[in-house]
């Protein structure tokens, strides 16, 4: 029996129907500004691959790789196999991993805005250090500061978006973070394509321009309202209700406000959320917080995003062609996010994840076959096969962009109860950054060892994650964020694990139904 066979409409439907509100200008602006944090994340993902393909950058910081690229006659797949070079990319994510664990308590105690502002300031410092780097130590320190910014931003922004958005549009608005991320990746690709021609100092401009969205994130964080959930959790009930009325555009927010009060009362009774999250009743959310970000990285998307120009060069593309091809894939990724925004709250999370997984598997297998048959040490891809590889990679990126890209963040951010929400998001970010670090550090060596088989390696993982979603992930579309507990209690598998008193829940639903009917009669 598939995990999503139960329609979410049966989960606290009566309570959810009492929620009122629309997408107001206030909530739209707040979500747009908050999502800028995603653009910085995307920019840092996309910029590294282009920078490490620039000769001036390699000659200054990684001369051995520069000489290997220029003069060595060896396996095409091994041109960039250097652990110090990999550390330039991966150090950012290791720092982000550590920062995300610190960001959890800060986000809970001081609010979502505090973490957004902290992330923006860290980004500014990191961008300045990278742009002015005179040695490898300064370069890596800048990447570490960028990582701290990612740890704070990725912890707070998805939470902020989930809590500000109306229930019926939560998925679409939450994906604003992914849209900003993909826009940042595309922007980085275009910047690299332009600065590649500036030779000696182009890489400095590429790295330094990260300061622009970082400044927007910092200023925006100072101007944004705090989420009503966070204000209520801090005991500011009246202020929380005022913000809720403003962002919903109505005074009739009693049902949603009461859910927030109930959740806050429980949250404030929990003194150790990281310990609480290990309890049996939180097991489904914990499993999703670990597996969703793990699987997102194991799609293999980061081999395209981090190393697109070097990867295309390894396949025989010239320098300009490699940067151009990576810019094309960045544009496809950015545009694909609009598909997810338009469909996630109509078709649901499960449909997008499963169909996207099938498309990614197909594309990766085709690329592996082409490279295995037509490309090797003494072979170069013909123009027609090169174009076919780029098309297949674009179709792979397209599928990721409307499935695992946004939903790998959206699903974990919307399933936790308030008392463990910050802790849960910290775990999601930490797991994501840990596996991002592992893939970023090991990919050049994996590419050298597996050759074309690297695509089959990731295709195998996509097969596993697609089956996982089909079996274990219930549909969260249309379920109020504070009512997710009913979803797990009625799921065919998780109801065997999650303790509870269904009869109490059922009576609560019956009472709410009666109240709703009575109010209509009046």
Swiss-Prot record:
Segments passing through the bilayer: 23-43, 87-107, 121-141, 144-164, 173-193, 205-225, 286-306, 322-342, 351-371, 384-404, 430-450, 453-473
Membrane topology of this protein: Multi-pass membrane protein
A Pfam family annotated for this UniProt entry: Sugar_tr
CDD domains xref list: MFS_STP
Cellular component aspect of the GO annotation: membrane
Homology family: Belongs to the major facilitator superfamily. Sugar transporter (TC 2.A.1.1) family.
Name of this chain's protein: Sugar carrier protein A
Organism: Ricinus communis (Castor bean)
